[in-house]
C-alpha cells in the first residue's frame, strides 16, 4: 500500500462533503436488540438482521462525485458484441501486437463518445503495461481464449524501482509518447522526484476510466518471488474509475495485487467521490494486503488464494481504507479463501486488516482517519487462516483490532473496527 502526501492532508481534514448525510442517511446501522450479536472482540459476527443490511444494492447505491452523485448501479453480466470487434490484438498477424496500441488507437478514433469499445485479445503473453486514461470511452478488454489463463498481461514492476528503472522497464520501446491518450499517466511516474516510484506507479494495468471492464484474461505482476519477503508492492491491476467490472479474470501478484482505488488525474488520493467495483467469478492471488483500497467493492464468487513462497512474516488478504462516514467498503459473498502449504502449521494468514491511511504521524483519529469496512458472508475459509483472530492490527498505525460485540452496538462506531463475518464455513 501507499501513502499520499496530499491525500494524508485531505484525510486529516476529512473534506468528504458529509458522505453519510448525503448518501446514506437511511442506513445508519445499529445492532438489533432482539438478536444477541455473536462472536468475540477478536472475531465479531453479524446477526442475520444486521447482515441483511449489507447488500450489493446498498454498496452500489450511489457513486461518482459527491457533489453530484450518480444513481444506483446494477451491474449485469459482461456481454460481447455479436459482430467481430474492430480492435484486435495478437502476438502476430493482427492489426495490433500490443494492447496499449489498440487502446490508444481506439480512444483517438472514438474520442469521448459513450459507445463502448471492445478490444479483443488473442491468446498469448503480452509483456507490457496497459494504461486507460481518465475520460476515455467505456472500454472492455477481453480474452479470446477458452479460459482466462490463455491471455496473460504481465510485467515485473516493483514499488522500490527508481524512476530510471521504471522508465526502462515500462517505456524502453517508446510505448508511451507525448500526445498519446495515456501519456499523462506515464509522465506522472516517469518524472517523479522521489527516490522510488511507490505503489501508485507499480501497476501493470491501470485504469482511471469509468465503466472499464476486464473479461476472461489474466493480469500478473510477475515480480512474484524474485524479491524477498520485505516491502515490495507489485500491483497487477489498479482501478480509479466508477462502475468497474472484472469478470472471469485471474489477478496474480504478491504484495498489493489488486488496488481498487479512488484517485484523481494527478494521481492524488481524493475524498470527494466514490468508486464502485464489481468482481465476479474470478481468482486473486497474493500474500500481503493483496486486495486493498477505498472503493465500494463487491466480490461475488471470488477465489482468494494466499501464498507463502516469498516467506513474508505476515499475510493479509483484504486491506480497505474506507472513509469513516461511508458505511460500505468491501463486501465478499459466496467466495472461497485458501492458502498454500506454508499456512498448514502454526503460522496462519489473516483475512485482512484496516488500512489507516494518512495516520502514520498522528495515529488513528476516530472519525477522521480511514476505518476500513469489510463483510465476508456465506463463504468458505480453509485451515490456512487464523480462525480465532482472523483480523490483524491496522496497517500504517498498528492500531490493535477491536471488534464490537455490544448488544446495542452501532456498526459504524468509530471507536471500533468494522471488519465482520456472517455465516461462513470454516474448514477444520
Where are these regions (language model features)?
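Bacterial N-terminal signal peptides that target proteins for export
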Residues: 10-18
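Sequence-level preference for short, compositionally simple segments enriched
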Residues: 38-92, 96-428
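C-terminal motif of bacterial Sec signal peptides marking the signal peptidase cleavage site
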Residues: 29-31
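Short, Lys/Arg-enriched N-terminal segments with co-localized hydrophobic residues
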Residues: 1-10
